[in-house]
Curated annotation (Swiss-Prot):
5-phospho-alpha-D-ribose 1-diphosphate binds at residues 79, 104, 131-139, 200. Gene3D superfamilies: 3.40.50.2020. Belongs to the UPRTase family. Its cofactor is Mg(2+). The lineage of its organism: Bacteria, Bacillati, Bacillota, Bacilli, Bacillales. This is Uracil phosphoribosyltransferase. Uracil binds at residues 194, 199-201. The gene is upp. Pfam families: UPRTase (PF14681). It comes from Staphylococcus haemolyticus (strain JCSC1435). It catalyses: UMP + diphosphate = 5-phospho-alpha-D-ribose 1-diphosphate + uracil. Keywords: Allosteric enzyme, Glycosyltransferase, GTP-binding, Magnesium, Nucleotide-binding, Transferase. Binds 1 Mg(2+) ion per subunit. The magnesium is bound as Mg-PRPP.
Length: 209
């Protein structure tokens, strides 16, 4: 069974309160999502493999630690996932970025893929899938299905808030994918929106309705 990591760091929770607030404007909302994405990425990448390298400081030579060179890819689920991408890239600027476009059918609530553009060597990369919300789980599950069909194996999912229903569905569908979230909310309402939630992340990021 995959692990669910809920981040209780004070800075994340502080910023998340403003992300949730309906009075937070588009510019501030976008900046906050970017910042929380960066803070979360710090923990999501905690176990990246290191290797020893010999360097010379102004004083002497020494053995230091650097990333072992394992390839990393960030895959935002369009369009809201774009809001978290730059935050992760600020920590790992050499990572490749793929994109998967999905929309939720309002009648069936199922995710439908309309776009996918990924690094050619996606099967060799450690992957962080990002999307601000995990509601029904349909989009995340379909995105990870798409990645696995292309040979991806080492996948993690990162989001701001999640509903218990979505977490359960994700674990049932992909028990090998760890889930990283800033907050686990109460439930989905009758329209499949996370409650208390933060509204529509894509609309709030891009100023659309």
């Amino acid at each position: 069974m995959s692990k669910v990591h809920v981040f209780d760091h004070p800075l994340i929770q502080h910023k998340l309160s403003y992300i949730r607030d309906m009075n937070t404007g588009t510019k501030e909302f976008r900046e906050l999502v970017d910042e929380v994405g960066m803070l979360m990425a710090y923990e999501v990448t905690r176990d990246l493999e290191l290797q020893d390298v010999e360097i010379k400081t102004p004083v002497t030579t020494m053995t230091a630690k650097r990333l072992a060179g394992k390839k990393l890819a960030i895959v935002p689920i369009l369009r809201a996932g774009l809001g978290m991408t730059d935050g992760v890239l600020s920590l790992v600027p050499a990572a490749r970025v793929g994109h998967i476009g999905l929309y939720r059918d309002p009648n069936t609530l199922k995710a439908v893929e309309y776009f996918a553009k990924l690094p050619q060597d996606i099967d060799e990369r450690q992957i962080i899938v990002v999307d601000p919300m995990l509601a029904t789980g349909a989009s995340a599950i379909e995105a990870i299905n798409s990645l696995k069909k292309r040979g991806a194996k080492n996948i993690r999912f990162m989001c701001l808030i999640a509903a218990p229903e979505g977490v359960e569905k994700m674990q049932e569908a992909h028990d090998d994918v760890d889930i990283y979230i800033a907050a686990l909310d109460e439930k989905l309402n009758d329209k499949a929106y996370i409650t208390p939630g933060l509204g529509d992340a894509g609309d709030r990021l891009f100023g659309t309705k």
